[in-house]
């Protein structure tokens, strides 16, 4: 009997120490959005310095994001979508990288990094330039000329990236608070290889 009482007392004390000190966190009043910072943009390969280029030539870019949770509870990034665009003489710019991050959790006060990578195909740019009228009145010849100029400048790290996106945050432990959607935008120049 004494042994059972001692075991019960020991278990009770251990539970009190483990759960009593931590306590339950109160429900937050509102969701602070996860902050998104572009840590860097990298070009991962070199290309020929000047035309003629091969239609299968690729440039591979990686954008390194740092996501921070300013909340004191676990935050879930339900969606993060971004587009990296480069000036091409049109208001829309040329999209060189676009991606969406799958859902991810970030610990209270924690950080994670996300580094999407995507190839940009030289041959694919011509169709994009033609449909958007980048070649101007010169049509196909103008689009080919503009594509070669664009590709040369891009490979020489002479272009500035415009990165726009949005992130949706929620609290898995407090679904009644809903979600918060936050937009972000920045400009970045690729450092030379």
Which role does the model predict for each range below?
Residues 59-61, 80, 112, 161:
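Hydrophobic core residues within well-ordered beta-strands of beta-rich domains
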